[in-house]
Amino acid sequence: MRQTSWYVITGAPCSGKTSVICELERRGFRVVHEVARACIDRDLKNGKTRESIKADVPAFERRILHEKIRVESLLPDRETIFLDRAVPDSIAYYQIEGLPLDDPIEKSGAVCYKKIFFFERLPFEKDTVRTENTDFAARIDRELKNSYRRIGYSLTSVPVLPVRDRTDFILEHL
């Protein structure tokens, strides 16, 4: 298992993860932006529709899992890095979609993250990439917590606060 100095920022869609990742980046920290969002944005720019991107859910989830693995494989172990989601998030998404959990659970065992910061939910807002609804957000919130705990992580809960305060909270709890 790879021992790393990486911190995972996770939580349901629309919980403020990306805003805090951007604030950490603004403060000079190395970050990895959400892989799924980057893949979807790239596909949209190449002319695909949201519907066509997610039409084959198993293929989409496998693509995201393997892209997360690829991105993480390129990161230096000993550098402090903040990740907007990580490989274990795929366990929750596979669970919700009724897909076999063997692959994401096995792949999640390859890396040991320094700490998992779990963001409490904010009011839900849709955007061009986020197509889920409030019910899905509540369900994925539960599944994400279960997924990280299932593979042995404890979660540091990040309360609902303004972006700068949430960022300070994380930095105070490294």
Language-model regions, residue ranges each:
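Conserved glycine(s) of the Walker
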Residues: 16
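A glycine- and Lys/Arg-enriched "phosphate-lid" helix/loop adjacent to the NTP-binding pocket
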Residues: 98-167
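The conserved Walker
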Residues: 13
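Pre-Walker A (Motif I) flank of P-loop NTPase domains
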Residues: 2-6
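Glycine-rich phosphate-binding loop used to anchor ATP phosphates in small-molecule kinases
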Residues: 61-111
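Conserved substrate/cofactor phosphate-moiety recognition/catalytic segment
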Residues: 22-67
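Hydrophobic anchor at the beta1->P-loop junction of P-loop NTPases
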Residues: 9
